[in-house]
Amino acid sequence: YDSYSIRQETVPVHSSAIKARGKWIPVIWPQDGRQADKGSGKNLTEQYKKEGVNMCPEWFTNPPQKGLREGTGGNSVEAGIMEMLVRMQTKRLKVFKNQNKLLEELRMHHRKDGKIVPMNDDLISALRYCIMSLRKARLKIYEPLQQLTDSEFNVFAR
């Protein structure tokens, strides 16, 4: 599909790029999205909402364990990376070859002393959030473009 990743840009610029991909698309955000922006003093989530971005009502968490309530799943990176790996191995996650930036991040992704090195992994993190939030995914229902049959349609009707 598509990806977007630009550093050091303003909220209005990011908002415009996000909305251009579909205003209805829900945006998943990390817990630190509630932190105040250094420039304005307002939290980033509220700034994006004000710009018309469809922000999810709550911050990202991994799926909860069976029987526990939503929001208790934590935000373990390891769980998300392993889910991505399993999905790739079972052909349930495919990355298009036009996703150069993501493919580069995947090539550079590595561990040191058994721990994931969090460096230049913005798109990997976004993909991890997406995969771990699939439980909340919904299809967009489109309204029919024309509600009248051809025989009922009257170009001169008011």
Which residues does each PLM region occupy?
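Mg2+-dependent endonuclease catalytic cores in nucleic-acid-processing enzymes, primarily RNase H-like
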Residues: Y1-P118, A137-I141, Q147, V155-R158
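Short, hydrophobic alpha-helical segments
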Residues: C130-R138
